[in-house]
Regions:
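Local sequence-structure signature of Cys/Sec-based thiol-disulfide redox active-site neighborhoods
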Residues: 48-78
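Residue-level recognition of specific faces of alpha-helices
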Residues: 68, 75, 85, 99, ...
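N-terminal leader/targeting and pre-domain segments
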Residues: 2-57, 137-146
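Acidic phosphotransfer microenvironment of two-component signaling modules
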Residues: 45-48, 97, 129
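Thiol-based oxidoreductase modules, predominantly thioredoxin-like and allied folds used
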Residues: 40-42, 61, 73-98, 105
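Non-catalytic, surface beta->alpha helical segment in thiol-disulfide oxidoreductase systems
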Residues: 107, 112-146
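Structural signal for hydrophobic/aromatic residues that build the beta-strand cores
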Residues: 47, 58-59, 76, 88-91, ...
Length: 146
């Protein structure tokens, strides 16, 4: 922890450094993980189950080394909060090559929207406007899951 404290940037004298450090220590990271709106899929069975159990599914096919994937990730989390009628999942294409091959994913990020187990839209690339428009169309008339 002392290395972390020393590596903090110098804060303006008007800001209380100890208050800042206390706020970092109080952050409950485990709680934010549990409340995430985008769920990691670990295997093909989980993927099939997510499609079967939800009326609208938004799939984010990403790679850990992909810069645009990292850039759009916070926006995808925000969209998951804005559209509760859709179930948001993500797969790492390097971890699940059979699923990504089955879906025909050729570039990252690729977003595929399923409605009633059928693919209804695909957005290739980090295009938040196109993604939101596709989600809006898919969730139209769908009630949020309780």
């Amino acid at each position: 922890m002392s290395f972390f404290i020393r590596s903090l940037p110098r804060l303006p004298k008007t800001y209380n450094r100890s208050v800042f450090l206390q706020s970092i220590n109080k952050r409950a990271f485990h709680q934010s993980i549990a409340n995430m709106g985008v769920h990691n899929i670990a295997n093909a069975t989980e993927f099939k189950s997510a499609l079967a159990d939800n009326q609208v599914v938004v799939l984010d096919a990403f790679a850990t080394w992909c810069g645009p994937c990292k850039a759009i990730a916070p926006r995808v989390v925000k969209l998951s909060e804005d559209y509760p009628a859709a179930h948001f999942i993500k797969i790492d294409v390097d971890e699940l090559p059979e699923v990504s091959q089955q879906l025909g994913i050729r570039a990252m990020p690729t977003f595929i929207i399923f409605k009633g187990n059928e693919k209804v839209a695909e957005v290739v690339g980090a295009n938040p406007v196109a993604l939101e428009n596709a989600i809006k169309q898919a969730v139209e008339g769908v009630e949020p899951k309780a």
